[in-house]
């Protein structure tokens, strides 16, 4: 009974936080900067509705937004469905795997209540949709890790949304799912699992090499989309020479995920707040992955299936986020929201997996 009361209290407080963030986004944040394309979606004319919305993310958002916008454009009422959808999606995913029983609830509450995450997923935006499909695909990935391979209608729908809104993420999520399926179901030898994992990584690197000329051409034109004279936070183009995209990738992937650099944090209060939030994220992720790190250091052992599937998904998505986040810290933080909850679920699973691993190990030792 205590657990039920505690659970209700946790989600009641979190619901209040999400509602407060909605009011903050509409009445404060929107006055300081723009809420992406939210206002445009919610003021679109009904004439934009067409069958093209099934294949184009922008037209889909315009079409749905034009209907919601009948209630007065962008306001608390028209953005409330986004807040509710985000809240119940997060609650469903966390409760599905009972993560609250294995993770410090205060830590979990903090990571789910981070400002930029709550603001961008609490208004009618593509980031809100990104949260939904990343949550559903994240739960499918964890189900695969647990040996449950049933793909339901909601998973197919999430794949569809991912292909419409962020098609570049899907190949790496699919690779992770296939690797887990093969390693868990058919490959029992650790050596062969290592071979498969290394082979998948090699194939990805080979593909990058084969399309390097196309990537270089893309890098040459990418900067112009961010080189807006009104964009005060746009950085200098780091890709001035051939293959700079690849040379700068290791540091660039981290910067694109983190957001503002130290110098930018020192020169802007808003960047300082965003930087502090990113520091909190890194600390929380390290905390969630602490047992995995300790196990690697102490025994040089690791779950090969988790390692390679996580590596492909996390680094693959980070690489694709890199060109969208390297030029502007604001864009980096906003676009990060699309896959942030997927990362949260993955790190929560690590925490749960190794907590249960050590608990079972202690029980065996106690019996001996």
Residue ranges: model-predicted function:
Residues 80-100, 283-290:
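Transmembrane-helix motifs of polytopic, lipid-linked glycan transferases
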Residues 59, 71-88, 279:
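Loop-to-helix entry region of an early transmembrane alpha helix in multi-pass inner-membrane enzymes
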Residues 93-115:
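Transmembrane-helix signature of polytopic, membrane-embedded enzymes
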Residues 37-73, 251, 256:
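Short hydrophobic/aromatic helix or loop-helix immediately within or flanking a transmembrane segment
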Residues 28-40, 163-299:
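Alpha-helical transmembrane segments and terminal signal-anchor/GPI-anchor hydrophobic tails
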Residues 122-129:
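Short acidic/glycine- and proline-prone juxtamembrane loop motifs at membrane-interface regions
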Residues 99-103, 147-152, 190-191, 266, ...:
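Membrane-interface helix-loop-helix junctions at transmembrane boundaries of multi-pass membrane enzymes
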Residues 130-146, 342-346:
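Specific aromatic-rich, kink-prone transmembrane helix
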């Amino acid at each position: 009974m205590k657990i039920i009361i505690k659970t209700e209290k946790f989600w009641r407080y979190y619901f209040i936080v999400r509602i407060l963030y909605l009011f903050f986004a509409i009445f404060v944040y929107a006055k300081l900067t723009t809420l992406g394309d939210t206002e445009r979606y919610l003021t679109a004319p009904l004439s934009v509705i067409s069958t093209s919305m099934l294949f184009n993310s922008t037209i889909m958002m315009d079409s749905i937004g034009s209907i919601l916008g009948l209630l007065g454009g962008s306001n608390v009422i028209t953005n409330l469905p986004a807040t509710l959808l985000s809240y119940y999606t997060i609650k469903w995913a966390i409760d599905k795997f009972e993560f609250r029983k294995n993770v410090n609830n205060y830590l979990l509450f903090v990571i789910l209540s981070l400002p930029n995450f709550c603001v961008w997923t609490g208004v009618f935006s593509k980031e809100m949709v990104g949260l939904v499909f990343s949550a559903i695909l994240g739960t499918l990935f964890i189900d695969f890790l647990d040996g449950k391979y049933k793909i339901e209608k909601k998973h197919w729908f999430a794949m569809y949304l991912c292909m419409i809104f962020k098609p570049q993420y899907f190949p790496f999520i699919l690779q992770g799912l296939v690797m887990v399926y093969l390693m868990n179901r058919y490959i029992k030898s650790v050596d062969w699992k290592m071979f498969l994992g290394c082979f998948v990584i090699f194939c990805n690197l080979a593909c990058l090499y084969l399309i390097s000329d196309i990537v270089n051409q893309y890098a040459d034109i990418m900067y112009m989309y961010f080189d807006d004279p009104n964009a005060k936070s746009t950085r200098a183009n780091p890709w001035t020479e051939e293959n700079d995209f690849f040379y700068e990738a290791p540091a660039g992937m981290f910067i694109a995920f983190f957001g503002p650099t130290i110098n930018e944090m020192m020169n802007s209060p808003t960047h300082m707040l965003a930087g502090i939030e990113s520091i909190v994220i890194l600390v929380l992720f390290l905390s969630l992955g602490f047992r995995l790190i300790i196990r690697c250091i102490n025994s040089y052992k690791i779950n090969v299936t988790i390692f390679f599937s996580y590596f492909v998904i996390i680094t693959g998505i980070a690489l694709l986020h890199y060109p969208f986040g390297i030029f502007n810290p604001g864009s980096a933080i906003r676009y990060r929201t699309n896959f942030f909850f997927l990362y949260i679920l993955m790190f929560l699973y690590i925490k749960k997996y190794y907590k249960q691993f050590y608990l079972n190990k202690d029980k065996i030792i106690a019996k001996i």
